[in-house]
Amino acid sequence: MYKRQRIGELIFNTAMTGYQEIITDLSYTDQLICFTYPQIGNTGVNKEDLESIAGGCSGIVIKELSKTESNWRKDNDLSSFLKEKNISGIANLDTRKLTRILRDNGSQISAIVPEEYSKKQIEALFDSFDGIKGKDLAREVSTREAYIWKEPSYRKETKKNSYKVVAYDFGVKHNILRLLVDRGCEVLVVPAETSAEDVMKENPDGIFLSNGPGDPEPCEYAISAIKKLIEINIPIFGICLGHQLLGLALNLKTEKMKFGHHGANHPVQNILDKTVSITSQNHGFTISEESLNDDVIVTHRSLFDKSIQGISSKDGRVFSFQGHPEASPGPKDIQNLFDKFIKNMQSQKSLTNAKKK
C-alpha cells in the first residue's frame, strides 16, 4: 500500500463493510483508522460510493489487504486509490491487539512513516501534532463557495423540489445530501462560516447542520449563527458535529470521549417511544451529561454507554442526532429522522401560508 508520513489520532472502526465510505468521510480528518475487520479491499473502489471528493482520513491500518477485488461497479483497487488521494496505509499488523490497546488506553496520537525514517525525524513529526482537541477542522474541510447539490441516491429519480434546504458544510457526507434530494429538497450547500443573515436571504424552508471533523467548541462562528437561526421560527436538523454545535448553541457543553464511537453496529434507544435502532457512528466528542438544561429534551441514548445520542427543543422544531442516520456505510434503521425534518418543514410552510391568508 501507499506509505508516506502521516500523523493523526489513531481510532478503531468496527464496521465489517463500507471501507470506501469510511475512508472518504471528512469527519476522519487528521485521524488514522484501524479497521477491526481482518481483510480490507475485497470490493475495490467505485466512483458512486465516495463520501467526499478530497478523501477524508490521514491513513489506514489493516490486518490484510485483499489480493483480489470482486465488484461489478469497481473502478479502482484500494491501494491505487489511497495513492491517488494521498492517504497512507499499512498492512499485516495485529489489528486485534492494537484495538485492545486503544480500547483500554483511549485513542492515541500515532504515525505511519517510511522505513528509512530516523528516530529524530519521527520525534520531530510527533512534536508537530498535538491532537484534535481544541482544533477547528470544520473550517479547513468546508467548501469555499456555495453550490446546489442535485444528485439523488444511486438509481433513484430526482423528485420535484418541494422544500429549500440550506445545508451547512462542516465536512458533509454526500449521502446526506442525496437523501435530502430523494425527499424533494432543493439543497444549497454553504460554507461553514456563512452567517445566519446570509442564510435567511435564501428564504429556506429548513436548515441542515452537517457532520464534520474536530472539536466543536472552537467553531464559535457556527455556534453564533446557529443561535440566531434558533431564534427564527425555522426547522433545524443536525447530524454528528452539527448535533454537537446545536447543543452548544442551546447552552450545553461537549467533551472528548476516551476512544469515541466508530462503527456500524451501535444500538441506540429512542427515549420517547422506547424503540431501538442499530446505527452507524463516527464521533470522538459528545454532549456533556452535566450540562443538560430544562430547554432541551434528550431523545436518544446509546445502549453501549448511555451517552447522549439525540436532542430536541421542546416543540420538536429543532433537533439533532449524534450518529449517522444516512449510514453509508451501515444500517438504515434511523433514516426516518430525515422524514421528521421534512414533516417539520411541511408543518412550518402550512402555518406560514395560513397566516398569509
Model-derived features with residue positions:
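A short, acidic, flexible beta-alpha connecting loop/helix-capping segment that sits on the rim
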Residues: 315, 325-329
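Proline-centered loop/turn at the N-terminus of a beta-strand
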Residues: 88, 164, 235-237, 253, ...
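RNA-binding accessory domains that recognize and position tRNA/RNA substrates
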Residues: 3-197, 201-202, 216, 328, ...
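Cysteine-nucleophile active-site neighborhood
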Residues: 205-206, 210-281, 286, 330-348
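Active-site-proximal beta-strand elements of phosphoester/diester hydrolases
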Residues: 164-168, 279-280, 319-323
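Catalytic beta-strand/loop cores that center a nucleophilic Ser/Cys/Thr
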Residues: 275-316, 354
